[in-house]
């Protein structure tokens, strides 16, 4: 039917390309031996992009994702903090992902890099509240668009909030399953810590990094799916898990308490006068700034935990309170139970009237 008809060279080339494409597709469909492969010179970049798309935020301040010292953070997002229960007090989580070969350990440089990221986040946060340089356009932009995050430094106790920081590495299940699995790594070092002073969790120089393994085949399959709901559900699940696992790690190392000053006790004045004894151990993470969080290292490296608790109990109501829990209900019960000891002021004591009676002999 097309005899004696003429076609341009471009049309013939297009026909040949289309024929080659559909012929190959047909052969692939008919032959199980023909497979497609993904070739990557540096698979770390591919894995990093997969994880960032699945757990990260994209609306990140430029000074955090691309830091002033030239370092580029792999993953960052805001989520509920470790030390509080309020949803309206988000904190930045910092992550680093690597596609490690089996048996490969995380190097010292990678750990140091994560600690540096955390220090930079702290400084960026403080600049939002303490730097008024109107000529710094980036700072003013961040203040306007990211000023909803709480201040990491507590002015009353001079303590610092805990920065969540983690490694996430790929792992293949032994049976090569696509099961959704993410867990604390089975390597020797499940977490890393860095501190200048012992027994000061709420110190600016006390930093931590946790390490998780994720089923590589699952995240690749999830990344490739055109299913926004599944991806969002996994993101929510993983963020919640990261927070809880870091809290578990901290709870294994520290005893956490909540404390509130006795009536007629000036908490701010007391903490200022006993600054050296409480520095790095006390922080105010709650909306009720009359309630403080106290963290003491279980190993008691200074050998004075009990002495400090005894002294603090002379001035504060103190209860056991797991990290991130709301202490208001329990501490209110303690205050109500004990307030009779503190209810009367000197003025009220002077106004008391003693009433009695004497039995008559008649």
Language-model segments: residues:
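Interdomain/boundary linker segments immediately adjacent to catalytic/signaling cores
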Residues: 1-45
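Catalytic core segments in nucleotide and nucleic-acid processing enzymes
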Residues: 30-361
């Amino acid at each position: 039917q097309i005899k004696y008809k003429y076609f341009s060279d471009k049309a013939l080339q297009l026909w040949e390309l289309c024929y080659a494409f559909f012929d190959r597709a047909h052969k692939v469909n008919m032959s199980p031996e023909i497979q497609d492969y993904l070739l990557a010179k540096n698979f770390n970049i591919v894995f990093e992009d997969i994880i960032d798309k699945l757990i990260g935020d994209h609306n990140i301040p430029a000074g955090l994702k691309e830091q002033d010292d030239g370092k580029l953070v792999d993953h960052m997002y805001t989520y509920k903090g470790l030390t509080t229960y309020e949803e309206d007090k988000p904190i930045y989580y910092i992550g680093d992902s690597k596609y490690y070969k089996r048996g490969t350990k995380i190097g010292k440089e990678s750990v140091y890099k994560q600690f540096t990221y955390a220090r930079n986040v702290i400084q960026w946060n403080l600049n939002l509240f303490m730097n008024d340089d109107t000529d710094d356009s980036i700072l003013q932009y961040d203040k306007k668009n990211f000023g909803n995050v709480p201040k990491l430094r507590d002015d009353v106790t001079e303590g610092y909030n805990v920065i969540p920081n983690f490694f996430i590495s790929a792992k293949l299940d032994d049976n090569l399953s696509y099961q959704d699995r993410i867990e604390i790594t089975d390597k020797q070092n499940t977490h890393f810590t860095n501190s200048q002073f012992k027994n000061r969790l709420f110190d600016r120089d006390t930093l931590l990094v946790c390490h998780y393994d994720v089923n590589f085949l699952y995240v690749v399959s999830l990344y490739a799916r055109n299913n926004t709901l599944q991806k969002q559900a996994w993101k929510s699940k993983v963020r919640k898990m990261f927070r809880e696992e870091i809290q578990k790690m901290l709870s294994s190392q520290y005893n956490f308490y909540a404390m509130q000053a006795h009536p007629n006790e000036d908490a701010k004045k007391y903490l200022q006068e006993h600054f050296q004894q409480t520095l790095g151990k006390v922080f105010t993470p709650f909306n009720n700034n009359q309630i403080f969080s106290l963290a003491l290292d279980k190993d008691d490296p200074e050998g004075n935990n009990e002495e400090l608790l005894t002294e603090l109990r002379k001035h504060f109501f103190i209860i056991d309170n797991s990290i991130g829990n709301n202490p208001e209900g329990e501490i209110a019960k303690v205050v109500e139970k004990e307030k009779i000891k503190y209810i009367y002021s000197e003025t009220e004591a002077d106004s008391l009237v003693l009433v009695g009676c004497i039995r008559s002999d008649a």
